[in-house]
């Protein structure tokens, strides 16, 4: 119909499918290359056809350009959250424990097993620590493996809560953790930041940028990042936050200021409106 196409990628779709196909045991090895090539063909077609292509962070835009998208089509529009809903959550009252939260689905891509092993190592050095894993089950078999691992390691201080009201539950937490193998721009980190909770993450997607800030950012570090599947690094990073309440408070303030400036829902909506107005203007202000 010769209509303009607007493409939004929260992750790099083709790269994510490539990772899944490479890992998939049920795909015949000789067919994997063909299937991956098919997704790259689709990616090239939509990049060529699109009027605008948006993504969540700068490195994702660089990848889109490397994959053949014209730089002039690309825009970065960050995720936005309801800042006011979370910013008033009080810091946890001192009770002799350090409580770590993980707002995460029980799925292999979230690498809950590495989180559990890292907490096991942390528990050898910090005794008064608890881990709250908050989220539903995406993969029942994987979830059962995680439950069994906790039993095998005799980790009584890991709590699987299921889905919770994150606004209410955040009051119980000192900081949060995310151990994903792949991410875009995780909302769970932004929500933690809005509530003045620093975060430990893996160095995937936009996590490093969220923790350290963009070039123009003046707020300072909001937590620590380590390589994916690096349990020792995760344990060390968690320990740094466990042993220093002033460090948690300072990084939490940095985190909240960063979200307030760059990642509010209102900012995101206005940036998308600008893209729609560009298309309207191109088409003589006719309907898209």
Protein language model features and the residues they cover:
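Membrane-proximal helix-turn-helix segments that form the acceptor-binding/catalytic region
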Residues: 12-13, 32-53, 67
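Carbohydrate-associated surface elements
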Residues: 59, 80
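Glycosyltransferase donor-sugar binding loop
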Residues: 81, 103, 130-144, 160
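Conserved donor-binding/catalytic core segment of Leloir-type glycosyltransferases
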Residues: 92-110, 116-119, 132
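Nucleotide-activated donor-binding/catalytic signature segment of Leloir-type glycosyltransferases, i.e.
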Residues: 143-163
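Aromatic "clamp/platform" in nucleotide-sugar-dependent glycosyltransferases that forms part
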Residues: 181
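Short hydrophobic beta-strand element within catalytic cores of glycosyltransferases
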Residues: 198-201, 205-212
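Conserved acidic donor-binding segment of nucleotide-sugar-dependent glycosyltransferases
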Residues: 213-231, 240-245
């Amino acid at each position: 119909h010769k209509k303009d196409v607007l493409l939004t990628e929260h992750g790099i779709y083709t790269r994510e499918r490539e990772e899944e196909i490479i890992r998939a045991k049920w795909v015949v090895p000789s067919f994997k290359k063909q299937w991956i090539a098919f997704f790259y063909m689709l990616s090239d077609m939509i990049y060529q056809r699109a009027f605008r292509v948006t993504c969540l962070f700068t490195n994702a835009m660089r990848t889109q350009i490397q994959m053949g998208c014209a730089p002039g089509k690309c825009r970065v529009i960050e995720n936005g959250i309801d800042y006011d809903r979370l910013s008033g959550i009080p810091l946890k009252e001192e009770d002799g424990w350090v409580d770590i939260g993980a707002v995460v689905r029980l799925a292999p891509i979230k690498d809950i097993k590495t989180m559990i092993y890292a907490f096991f190592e942390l528990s050898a050095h910090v005794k008064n620590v608890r881990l709250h894993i908050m989220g539903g089950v995406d993969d029942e078999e994987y979830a059962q493996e995680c439950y069994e691992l906790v039993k095998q390691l005799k980790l009584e201080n890991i709590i699987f809560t299921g889905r919770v009201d994150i606004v209410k539950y955040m009051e119980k937490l000192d900081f949060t953790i995310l151990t994903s193998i792949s991410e875009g721009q995780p909302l769970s980190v932004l929500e933690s930041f809005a509530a003045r909770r620093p975060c430990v993450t893996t160095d995937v997607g936009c996590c490093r940028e969220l923790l350290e800030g963009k070039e123009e950012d003046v707020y300072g570090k909001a937590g620590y990042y380590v390589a994916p599947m690096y349990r020792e690094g995760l344990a060390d990073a968690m320990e740094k936050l466990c042993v220093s309440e002033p460090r948690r408070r300072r990084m939490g303030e940095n985190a909240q200021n960063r979200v307030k400036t760059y990642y509010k829902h209102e900012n995101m909506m206005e940036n998308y409106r600008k893209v729609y107005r560009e298309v309207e203007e191109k088409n003589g202000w006719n309907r898209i």
